[in-house]
Regions:
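Loop/turn elements at helix/coil->beta-strand transitions in domains of secreted/extracellular proteins
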Residues: 11-13, 43-46, 162
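Flexible loop residues that form catalytic
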Residues: 20, 71, 172
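Short, basic, glycine/proline-bearing loop/turn elements
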Residues: 13-25, 139
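Structural motif
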Residues: 14-19, 49, 164-168
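Alpha-helical scaffolding within the catalytic cores
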Residues: 2-5, 32, 149-153
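Catalytic beta-strand/loop cores that center a nucleophilic Ser/Cys/Thr
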Residues: 86-163, 168-172
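Aromatic-Pro/Gly-enriched surface loop or interdomain linker
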Residues: 1-13
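A glycine-rich, often tryptophan-bearing local segment used as a flexible ligand/cofactor-contacting loop or short
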Residues: 23-102
Length: 174
């Protein structure tokens, strides 16, 4: 966060917000750095949110987030639902972005208690679902069944002149 406060965003094209704790990331950034990130993207730069980073990018009522991706996390009371290899399938737009995976029926990525997204109907940001979660993860924390499957796995959207990519899982760890 000190780097952001010291204008590191002026020297990069994209920022990656990794996994961890979306709430901690939100609090550590503080209001000024949150706005700096939003302004950075709006001016034409990019942002990638992975797991907790995707939580941070969401527009989830009563949750610490910076409203960048048009998604709402649901069932956050069971965010410790479990982890492992998760199945996903690419949508048509996702096949264009990930051409090396386009011919696969199903792909796998490490999932570790990431958000369960739905489009936030109150948000003006229009996001594109690039992939759909096919796994039903609910082995821990009394998480209900049939909550994760069929939900957005990768989403992308414009934000001002920039682009935002959100992943509920950990492609960097796969």
């Amino acid at each position: 966060t000190a780097d952001i406060a010291n204008n590191v965003l002026d020297s990069i094209d994209a920022i990656i917000i990794p996994g961890g704790s979306g709430k901690s990331q939100y609090l550590n950034l503080g209001t000024l750095n949150q706005q700096r990130i939003k302004d950075f993207i709006a001016k034409g730069k990019g942002a990638v949110g992975i797991c907790a980073g995707a939580y941070l990018f969401s527009n989830t009522p009563d949750y610490t987030c910076i409203q960048l991706n048009g998604q709402q996390a649901i069932d956050i009371e069971h965010d410790n639902r479990g982890h492992g290899l998760a199945k996903f399938t690419l949508c048509e737009e996702g096949k264009k972005i990930f051409p090396k995976l386009a011919d696969r029926d199903t792909s796998f990525v490490i999932y570790y208690e990431g958000p369960v997204f739905i489009n936030n109907p109150a948000d003006t940001i229009q996001s594109n679902t690039l992939a759909i979660m096919e796994s039903d993860v609910h082995e821990e924390g009394n998480a209900p069944a049939n909550m994760t499957n069929g939900k957005p796995f990768f989403v992308a959207n414009n934000y001002g002149k920039g682009r935002v990519f959100s992943s509920i899982a950990h492609p960097e760890g796969t």
